[in-house]
Design a protein with these regions (language model features):
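Catalytic phosphate/metal-binding cores of nucleic-acid and nucleotide-processing enzymes, i.e., regions
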Residues: 54-68, 77, 81-106, 111-112
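Basic, glycine-enriched DNA-binding surface that flanks or lies within the catalytic cores of DNA
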Residues: 1-59, 210
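Flexible, charged surface loops at secondary-structure boundaries
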Residues: 25-26, 66-71, 119-123
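Short hydrophobic beta-strand segments
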Residues: 72-78, 125-130
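TOPRIM fold recognition
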Residues: 95-211
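Hydrophobic, Leu/Ile/Phe/Ala-enriched alpha-helical segments that form helix-helix packing faces
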Residues: 4-9, 16, 90, 143-150
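Hydrophobic, well-ordered secondary-structure segments
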Residues: 41-72, 98, 105, 130-134, ...
Length: 211
């Protein structure tokens, strides 16, 4: 887990908070987001003014209304706070509640999370909100691979991302690395849409804090 300093959830628009409040517990000024795995295990993300703790856990924090088959857009993120901060910037995604689902995967996304969400929301287009840095961009690629029942190894050497995929090796400059560039290199097509904050911000949470 890692600490971040920010103004906290009180600065969020009430309409955004209303959409998610059924999946948020509040203790004083702290927002708690409960993650759960398929075995019933739980972990908690904490967000308040001056503190943000995100679990490394195999479960998810999941929000949607209606039946999973109705969902047309599934948004994936490392943290619930990032999801709320994204929706603060793009509240239009909340106008048709049964149309969208949001899942926070914690610091370390896993193949089991990707498979579970693919099965649950079989009709949904996937959107990712992972960090703009290299870790987030690699996570975009891992989600695409896992949803296709595949995997690859990623390694950074100097200014190059070295990829081992289906016994072949590929090299992409760190500065140019993205899901699109990866898919083009290895001939994979996921139809995943990646969302990154504008400017030099690393995440939607960071954008929310600093603007």
């Amino acid at each position: 887990m890692f600490p971040l300093t920010d103004t906290g959830p009180p600065a969020l628009d009430p309409g955004v908070l209303a959409f998610f409040m059924n999946r948020i517990a509040v203790q004083g000024q702290v927002f708690l987001f409960s993650y759960q795995d398929q075995q019933g295990g739980t972990a908690t993300e904490y967000w308040s003014s001056g503190l943000h703790l995100v679990p490394a856990f195999a479960g998810t924090w999941l929000v949607h209304e209606g039946f999973p088959a109705q969902v047309r857009h599934l948004f994936l993120s490392h943290s619930a706070a990032d999801i709320l901060c994204f929706c603060q910037l793009r509240p239009d995604w909340l106008t048709v509640p049964g149309n969208v689902a949001f899942a926070a995967l914690g610091l370390l996304a896993t193949a089991s999370q990707a498979r579970f969400l693919k099965e649950r929301f079989a009709n949904a287009k996937v959107h990712t909100l992972f960090d703009a840095g290299l870790t987030g961009r690699v996570t975009d690629c891992k989600i695409a691979l896992w949803r296709a029942g595949k995997d690859a190894a990623f390694r950074v050497m100097d200014d190059t991302v070295q990829i081992t995929y289906r016994r072949r090796k590929f090299n992409i400059p760190v500065s140019a690395f993205s899901l699109h560039r990866f898919e083009k290199a290895v001939a994979l097509r996921s139809n995943i849409r990646t969302h990154k904050p504008k400017g030099c911000f690393g995440s939607y949470h960071e954008f929310f804090v600093d603007t």
